[in-house]
A protein has these predicted regions:
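Outer membrane beta-barrel
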Residues: 23-37, 46-194, 205, 213-218
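Extracellular loop and loop/strand-boundary signature of outer-membrane beta-barrel proteins
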Residues: 44-47, 98-100, 161, 197-199, ...
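Detector for outer-membrane/organellar transmembrane beta-barrel domains
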Residues: 204-329, 340
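Structural signature of outer-membrane beta-barrel domains
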Residues: 34-38, 80-84, 131-135, 194-196, ...
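Membrane-embedded beta-strand positions in outer-membrane beta-barrel channels/transporters
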Residues: 58-60, 111-113, 173-175, 210-212, ...
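Residue-level detector of the transmembrane beta-barrel scaffold of outer-membrane proteins
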Residues: 26-28, 72-74, 123-125, 186-188, ...
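Outer-membrane beta-barrel "beta-signal"
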Residues: 328-330, 342, 360-376
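Outer-membrane beta-barrel proteins
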Residues: 2, 6-18, 59-67, 118-122, ...
Length: 376
C-alpha cells in the first residue's frame, strides 16, 4: 500500500511538471520618471515631475500555454502607471466620449486581451489593444511616441475640440495577426465595436476597423496602416480616419526614421485635415548610448468653413517641431535620458509639447526633461 501511494504521488508530480513546462506567466513593467520643465509662449513656464519621458510607465502580466501541434493560448494585461502619484490612468470602455473614465486605480488601459495563435496560421486576439496606425507611431517615431518630442504633439492635438477615443487604443476588438514565417512580410487587421443598441440614434458610434501591412528585412523596415472610426458628426467630433506610412533604415553609423500621418475628422461644420511629416535619426554613442533627433512639420488643410477663435481659417494653423535627446544605458534595464523639444506655431495654432500648458495662439511651446527609466 505504501509503495502504491508513493507511485501515485510520483506520477502526479510528473503530470504537474509537464503542465508547468507547457505554461508560463510573466510579471513585467516600466517605471520612468524625470524632471520636466515646459514653457508656453504668452502664458509662462512650469516645472514638474514628469512621467514617461522615455517609455510609458506600466505594469503588466502576460502568459502562454502550449496546446500542442503549434497551437498556443495566451493572455496580456497591461496598465499605465503614474508613479509620481501612485495612480493609474484613464481608459475608455466603448470607444466613445461617453465611455471615458477618470484616472485613479490601476486599470489595464494599454492592452487586455486573450489570444489563440498557431505557428502557421497566425494569431487571433479578443479584447483591448493598440489600433493599427499607432503601431507605426511606436516603431517609426524616433522618440517612440513618448516624451516632450513625440510626434503625437502635432498628429492628434487640436484635431477637434474633443479627444479621439480611438486615437491610440481601442476596446471591444477582434484582431488577426499574420504568422511570422512569411519572408519578412507582417501585418494585422482589427475591428472594434461601440456596443450600442441597433435602434439607437448613435448605433454606429465607436465602431472602427483598420489594418497594417509591412515588410522587414535586415536593416530595413517599412509599414503602412489605416484606421477608420465612426462617430455622429458634432461640432467637436465626427467620422475619423487616420492613415500613415513609416519606415526605418539602420545604416550602422546611424538609424534613420521617417513617418507620414494623415488625419481627417468630419465635423458638423466641415472636415479637419491634417498632414504631418517627420524625419529623424538615432546615432549610437559607443556601446552605451544614443543621440535622438527629429524634425516634424504639420500642414493643416481643413475646410475653409472651419474657423479659429479669432475668426481666421483654421487651415493657416500650421506648426513645426524639433526634438533632440540623449539616452545613456547604465545597464540592460536602467537608463538615464535627456530630451529637448520646441514647437513653432503659425496662425492661431496652440500646439504644445507633451506635459506642457497650451500657449497663446500663434506662440511657441518648448520643454526639456531629465529622467531615469527602469524596466523589470
Amino acid at each position: 500500500m505504501k509503495q502504491r501511494t508513493l507511485w501515485m504521488w510520483s506520477a502526479l508530480g510528473l503530470v504537474c511538471g509537464a503542465v508547468h513546462a507547457q505554461s508560463s506567466v510573466t510579471l513585467f513593467g516600466v517605471v520612468d520618471l524625470g524632471v520636466l520643465h515646459t514653457r508656453a509662449g504668452g502664458v509662462g513656464s512650469a516645472t514638474a515631475l514628469g512621467n514617461g519621458g522615455l517609455s510609458t510607465s506600466r505594469i503588466g502580466f502576460r502568459g502562454t500555454e502550449d496546446l500542442g501541434g503549434g497551437l498556443r493560448a495566451g493572455f496580456w494585461l497591461e496598465g499605465s502607471l503614474n508613479p509620481d502619484s501612485g495612480t493609474g490612468r484613464a481608459t475608455n470602455t466603448n470607444n466613445q466620449p461617453s465611455g471615458a473614465t477618470t484616472a485613479g486605480p490601476l486599470v489595464f488601459d494599454r492592452m487586455s486581451f486573450v489570444s489563440l495563435s498557431h505557428t502557421q496560421w497566425g494569431e487571433v486576439r479578443l479584447g483591448r489593444d493598440f489600433i493599427p496606425t499607432h503601431y507605426n507611431s511606436i516603431y517609426f517615431d524616433p522618440f517612440n511616441a513618448n516624451g516632450v518630442a513625440r510626434a503625437g504633439n502635432l498628429t492628434f492635438s487640436g484635431v477637434g475640440t474633443a479627444p479621439l477615443p480611438t486615437g491610440i487604443t481601442g476596446s471591444n476588438t477582434v484582431s488577426y495577426w499574420l504568422p511570422r514565417q512569411l519572408g519578412g512580410v507582417y501585418g494585422m487587421a482589427m475591428a472594434g465595436t461601440g456596443e450600442n443598441l441597433s435602434n439607437a440614434a448613435n448605433s454606429d458610434d465607436g465602431n472602427f476597423a483598420g489594418a497594417r501591412l509591412g515588410y522587414a528585412s535586415g536593416a530595413f523596415d517599412v509599414a503602412a496602416a489605416v484606421t477608420r472610426s465612426q462617430f455622429s458628426a458634432t461640432a467637436t467630433i465626427g467620422n475619423y480616419t487616420h492613415a500613415n506610412i513609416g519606415g526605418s533604415w539602420d545604416a550602422g553609423f546611424a538609424k534613420f526614421f521617417a513617418l507620414y500621418n494623415r488625419v481627417t475628422v468630419k465635423l458638423a461644420a466641415g472636415s479637419v485635415r491634417k498632414n504631418t511629416a517627420e524625419i529623424g535619426a538615432h546615432i549610437p554613442v559607443f556601446d552605451v548610448g544614443r543621440i535622438r533627433l527629429s524634425y516634424a512639420y504639420l500642414d493643416d488643410r481643413s475646410d475653409s468653413a472651419l474657423r479659429t477663435a479669432g475668426g481666421q481659417p483654421r487651415s493657416g494653423d500650421d506648426a513645426r517641431q524639433i526634438g533632440v535627446g540623449y539616452v545613456h544605458n547604465l545597464s540592460k534595464r536602467t537608463a538615464l535620458y535627456g530630451t529637448y523639444a520646441r514647437i513653432s506655431n503659425r496662425g492661431e495654432a496652440r500646439y504644445t509639447v507633451s506635459g506642457g500648458t497650451a500657449p497663446v495662439g500663434g506662440h511657441g511651446s518648448s520643454g526639456w526633461e531629465l529622467g531615469v527609466r527602469h524596466t523589470f
